[in-house]
Amino acid sequence: MRLLALFAFAVAVVSAQRNQMCQQPRTQGSCDASNQITKFFYTGSGCTSAPVCSDTDGGYGTEDECIQACTVQGGHHNEGAGEEGCSGDPPRGDCGGQVEERYYFDSTTRTCQTFEYRGCSSGNPDNSYETEIECEIACPSASS
């Protein structure tokens, strides 16, 4: 059981790091063309390439890496995303567990909203995201 908990924690840490990198703005840096490389950046609607200085942090080496890390198609975000993950009531529950602030996609306002999660599901478990950024990536119409 401890091994499973450790694995889940490791996955959560990697996911959080990936989300942060997806949201980093592209920085050009200052270098001549001979020191530039192409990296891929998430733009909110997909991954696009851009020339950057070779020592620039952020971005992905390939379009596939960017897609895997930053889009629903890459499987990084809630697998129920799309119509199922971006609709219905969030899983508020009332199990008496510790209250945790999470985000869900409100299909009426087409925005990501907060809700109090209490450790069990009484709504759509796919419409629950740990961060607002994760919700906006999974439900693109939230950020447009």
Swiss-Prot record:
Disulfide bonds join 22-70, 31-53, 47-66, 86-139, 95-120, 112-135. It is found in: Cytoplasmic vesicle, Secretory vesicle; Secreted. Residues 74-85 are annotated as: Linker. The N-terminus is blocked. SUPFAM superfamilies: BPTI-like. Coiled coil: none annotated. Expressed in salivary glands. Residues 1-16 form the signal peptide. The modification Pyrrolidone carboxylic acid is found at residue 17. SMART domains: KU. Keywords: Blood coagulation cascade inhibiting toxin, Cytoplasmic vesicle, Disulfide bond, Hemostasis impairing toxin, Protease inhibitor, Pyrrolidone carboxylic acid, Repeat, Secreted, Serine protease inhibitor, Signal, Toxin. One of its GO terms (cellular component) is transport vesicle. GO terms for molecular function: serine-type endopeptidase inhibitor activity; toxin activity. Residues 18-73, 86-139 form the BPTI/Kunitz inhibitor domain. One of its GO terms (biological process) is envenomation resulting in negative regulation of voltage-gated potassium channel activity in another organism. Tick salivary thrombin inhibitor that plays an important part in the anti-hemostatic strategy of ticks. This is Monobin. It comes from Argas monolakensis.
